[in-house]
Amino acid sequence: MAATGVLPFIRGVDLSGNDFKGGNFPEHVKSMTSLRWLKLNRTGLCYLPEELASLQKLEHLSVSHNSLTTLHGELSSLPNLRAVVARANNLKNSGVPDDIFQLDDLSVLDLSHNQLTEIPRDLENSRNMLVLNLSHNSIDNIPNQLFINLTDLLYLDLSDNNLDSLPPQMRRLVHLQTLILNNNPLMHAQLRQLPVMVSLQTLHLRNTQRTQNNMPTSLEGLSNLTDVDLSCNDLTRVPECLYSLVNLKRLNLSSNQISELSLCIDQWTKLETLNLSRNQLTSLPSAICKLSKLKKLYVNSNKIDFDGLPSGVGKLSNLVEFMAANNNLELVPEGLCRCGKLKKLVLNKNRLVTLPEAIHFLTELEVLDVRENPNLVMPPKPVDRTAEWYNIDFSLQNQLRLAGASPATVAAAGGGNSPRDHMARKMRLRRCKDSAHDDQAKQVLKGMSDVAQEKNKSIEENGDLKYSDLKTKRWDKNLEKPQLDYSEFFLEDVGQIPGVSVWQIENFIPIQVDEAFHGKFYEADCYIILKTFLDENGALNWQIFYWIGQDATLDKKAGAAIHAVNLRNYLGAECRTIREEMGDESEEFTVVFDHEISYIEGGTASGFYTVEDTQYPTRLYRVYGKKNIRLESVPLKASSLDPQFVFLLDTGLEIYVWRGGNATLGGTTKARLFAEKINKNERKSKAEITTLMQNQEPPEFWEVLGGQPEEIKKHVPDDFTPIRPKLYKVGLGLGYLELPQINYKLSVEHKDKLKLDVVPELRLVQGLLDTKGVYILDCWSDVFIWIGRKSPRLVRAAALKLGQEVCGMLHRPKHAVVIRNLEGTECQVFKSKFKNWDDVLKVDYTRNAESVKQEAGLSGKVKKDVEQKDQMKADLTALFLPRQPAMPLTEAEQMMEEWNEDLDGMEGFVLEGKKFARLPEEEFGHFHTQDCYVFLCRYWVPVEYEDDKEKGKEKGEEGDDEEKQPEEDFQCVVYFWQGREASNMGWLTFTFSLQKKFESLFPGKLEVVRMTQQQENLKFLSHFKRKFIIHKGKRKLKVDSVQPSLYHIRTNGSALCTRTIQIATDSSNLNSEFCFILKVPFESTDNQGIVYTWVGRAADPDEAKLAEEIMNTMFDDTYSKQVINEGEEPENFFWVGIGSQKTYDEDAEYMKYARLFRCSNEKGYFAVSEKCSDFCQDDLADDDIMLLDNGKEVYMWVGTQTSQVEIKLSLKACQVYIQHMRSKDTENPRKLRLVRKGNEPHCFTRCFHAWSAFKTAPA
């Protein structure tokens, strides 16, 4: 394999993450004779493999995070070895060989996170050492001779050891740039060596027992020092030596005892990060405002108050992060809000009362943390001046126009809504007083008039204007070029730099060719060549050629010609596109490539479709995962099945989803959906998908798997964890290949910056794949090759060969295959390896009308049509309709009488247990919140008689007496009523029992109407003649008879909608405009209690009379009954029974204004609809926004399942409604209030009859 493969050309490979325990190291590594770097991190190695001896050109070796106990082996035989990284192993002193320090080129050594107790022997002989990392060991002493020869060191890390002192020879490290000594005692170190290290850039002395006495007196010579860390020490003030570091950029003084800062800090003019957290500071000096380059300032856990922050903090114009948590701040200076680049502001655990209003103008602010400030009141947000949200014009004029208002109304709404701009008026007055502007304007007018006079004079002298003055543009100049988007084919900087660019036509699309392959043309391909140069005037000019190969297909020829013209239009060039054919190139063309043109046999495939039968390989996959399923290929045999899992058998046009006996239903459903995606995206919906249960498989299923087994046994361990996929990026250079591995936990190659929650389990994301690259994804059981659309052809070819080598090199199952994926046509199994790879089209709902206008490149009427088509639809008509007027009492009584005249009979039933029992007539009109009722109503249907005169013409008078009159018809309506606290089992019981019986008794004449509490049919309510009573609990459930009960009588918009509902027994629920019934029971057999009908002083007299009748209906003579007016309540029974006297509402003005609107997107667009005046608490939809107008406030009620889009659109609709009502009802201006479900105030709940707790779903 190695002789004919690509292994000898590989210069670097990253095999980290593979399992090389127990001698599984691949032997083919010996064939990589050109290997320069090799990474074997996290591979489980216990010793260095022997194959390393064959890698004589190896320069960099990384074996971190393994179980190595020794580095003895062939390292000393590698003459070119430069770097050895063996961090996080089990190395001891004896495990580090002495002979590796005799290597002349060894310059990097990392032995950190091991078990060393002393410096490796002979380390001082490595004279060319540049980087030395011995941190996180147990070294307690550094020999004096170590740094005698290591004078070229650039990086030294000795942190997290047990060092007490430092050798004086460290002053020889004059080239050292980074020195890290964190977490060492260093109690005897005075750091006198520091001033000599003139090249030092980074100095970390965290937790090294630094005090004022053991710091150097001066560091003036360290002009390059930019990063200093002195945190977790015992400093009481800033060391004086730090003030001389004029180039300091990062300074960490956190976790010390510093109580004040000197004014000398203004010398740190280049400081970008300052950390003073966890000290004893009470204030910051004003000199800190002179640090104009400061980007990050941390002062957490100090004692700073408002006076401790300088007012000039706004001068820190580059400040990005400011953290002052756990201090004593009551306010923050308004100048802080002038730091326009501020992105993170943390002020939690303070004593904040409010924040400056300018906080809302920090447009780049991403994090504002003000938690644990109990008295904080956020300043109001400024009014948004933009009328258009989500491409919807929410201006009052536009919405009135859409609602069909008259032009006068629309104009009035616009005229009365524009507030005076006093600032603009001042500016106008100032401009009027400024005579300089007037003089300038007069000069401009005089100049224009002089030019016009000279032109007229020349016409009079010379007659008509010359022809050249009236010369028109050429016909082709007047043509309007279409606004086409070429950015998908050509980059932005194309043609902007002198040079040559070449594109190859592939699948109708131009793909840019690397500069190394310029002048090399495939005989079956076509190319576009652009030469950019500067003309004699220094302006950019271009030459555009398109080259045709002798064996090129028609689609490539056409594509080259078309895209050459597209390139000319994209550049705005005026040159011609020149056709060049293979073997007949012009001299002008060959000069572009210095007469060095070569032809290569072959070419890419044609872009035209070829009709051939697709061959699908048969694969068997095991499905695992909970939230997002993933597939792992397993051997194609019946023994691979396991009853714990779901398996997917893909035979091409037959896809089987097999569910094991112990597999979950959710996993089966997701596997079925996955199969549907395969069918739709890869099989053109031609495959048949079959779901199979264990022990119910058809014979053809077992034929594919080689026969049915005797028993399907569990063989996958319970702690099964899939092998982590490894993503490689193929690199190609001049004569070599590289295969680096992408660490997608720490990768910075994403198109968007990754957040921590994006890859919580080291998951791959689609953003890692670059369209210009080629990648290999090694999933152990499968190897995928992903080819980007703009990747070079040679890299593609090398990746295909390299994928085969990788597949055969490492130990993997026999059924593993290499699968090729082109960008945009990836298979579903490949996509499942990535997190949230979804091909759903992204829609931007935040576009406004201006952005829509900019997108349309049309003009005139066509442009307007495009804008109207792109605008999002919204219906706010309901907000501008008048409130539904209350129905007069006489009209309601007449309607009630008519409906009752048609009623022939009514039978009632109530659900008792699991059956419906007949309801006694004396209980008609009494309902309970936990019960379900059924009422069978029989109505007479009027019959239309024929005209007597027409009858007389057809029949004689004698026949009229004998003629039979037609029988009157009837109709049956079944009303099903369900209480708020009743379960849906009542409806199911009715559907399968009583309804079937009624349908058999009245075939074709039965209508079923389902109703819930307080959402009843008006016709149904009319049968109870305003005596509709709703009790709490169940009908036959014996409640505590000693507890008083209170009933509220209320009419909503019509006398038909009158209900008497039991509410909480609390005097705060009383209202002077309503009537209430209070039952106070006694513990006596003779007298069961006393019942009061309480009549408010402003109650309607008709309702007061009705309340007395309802009281007599509800209670028999065993109760004492009494009608009392407000203010005449007896103390003994009434106030004691109702639970003491409390304040209550004395008016119900809200009943005259109350309106409830629903804002929803359920129609596919944003629409507002109004509920009828008889609304109730259950009309509050949890997934929508509700607007409640009570005449003074407009409440915006937000449910728990409401989308953010609905919230934002509803807010704008609410503002439009308030603006409209301000002009319609000037005496009652509304205020906007926000209410979240479960936190409704009393002014909101009183608009609903009998408000109580929300219904909850059964557990």
Swiss-Prot record:
Spans of repeat Gelsolin-like: 509-589, 628-702, 757-830, 1170-1225
GO cellular component, one term: focal adhesion
LRR repeats: 7-32, 33-55, 56-78, 80-103, 104-126, 128-149, 150-173, 176-201, 222-245, 247-268, 269-291, 293-316, 317-339, 340-363, 365-385
Keyword Nucleus in annotation: yes
Organism encoding this protein: Danio rerio
Entry-linked PROSITE patterns: LRR
Function comment: Is a regulator of actin polymerization, required for proper myofibril organization and the assembly of cardiomyocyte cell adhesion complexes. Is a regulator of the length of sarcomeric thin filaments. Regulates cytoskeletal rearrangements involved in cytokinesis and cell migration, by inhibiting Rac1-dependent paxillin phosphorylation. May play a role as coactivator in transcriptional activation by hormone-activated nuclear receptors (NR) and acts in cooperation with NCOA2 and CARM1. Involved in estrogen hormone signaling.
GO biological process, one term: sarcomere organization
Name this protein carries in UniProt: Protein flightless-1 homolog
Keyword terms, alphabetized: Actin-binding, Activator, Cell junction, Cytoplasm, Cytoskeleton, Leucine-rich repeat, Nucleus, Repeat, Transcription, Transcription regulation
Tissue expression notes: Expressed in ventricular cardiomyocytes, where it particularly localizes to intercalated disks and costamere-like structures (at protein level).
Database matches in SUPFAM superfamilies: Actin depolymerizing proteins (SSF55753), C-terminal, gelsolin-like domain of Sec23/24 (SSF82754), L domain-like (SSF52058)
Keyword Transcription regulation in annotation: yes
Compartmental location: Nucleus; Cytoplasm, Cytoskeleton; Cytoplasm, Cytoskeleton, Microtubule organizing center, Centrosome; Cell junction, Focal adhesion
GO molecular function: actin filament binding; phosphatidylinositol-4,5-bisphosphate binding
Chief location bin: nucleus
